[in-house]
Amino acid sequence: IVMKDEVNAFLNTDLQAMLQEAGIKRLVLCGMQTHMCVEAATRAASDLGYEVLVVGDACATRDLKSGDTTVPAAHVHAATLATLDRTYAKVVTVDEALAALE
């Protein structure tokens, strides 16, 4: 378990050292706040050289407000996954992630 206080799970944690020590090269990421924690961890992991799978249907987020505009969670989620896919990660379904781990 890695306790974190930052959006990026690699920032100010031992995560990178733990992964290196274990010889891990591929990460499967999912979680809450697709547009924040999942995105930050995905970008950082990719920048550090990891192969990253983001399990899109195992992530979620919330509506975002900016002034008088509310962006629905589904749009935030889809836009974030589209940004990450094929640039920082491969976005997959739960079934695809499980098959990749076999």
Locate each region found by the language model:
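Active-site-adjacent betaalpha module
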Residues: 1-102
